[in-house]
Amino acid sequence: REGRVAEYTVAMIGPPDLPPREDVTLGERDVLQGMKVANVNPSVLSEYQLPILPEGVVVLETGLIAPRVGVQRGDILREIDGRKITVPADVVQALSTARRSVSLVVERGGQLVLLRFRL
């Protein structure tokens, strides 16, 4: 003010981890056993360098099977067999009703990728 320079010290904090991540790890009987998914929030966006608020859930860990069908850590899982994925529990539900083949729509690097595999 009035031509004077002022210096301030501001404490920086990390991005909020809200809404909660609600991590879900798929179990032994699930199609993509060991894959871990979570809600996307500002903390996850920063940690995985994701685009601004994508729709879907983020793959935190792939487990052993998911990489074999093309799923990568940091992918945003948007659809399973045409069902929109909005929360981690949707992944468990959609995969539990999977038939002989499964299709996944993931967002990777700003592009949508279709992954298909047989059970």
Q: How would you label these PLM feature ranges?
A:
Residues 1-119:
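C-terminal recognition in membrane/secretory proteostasis and scaffolding
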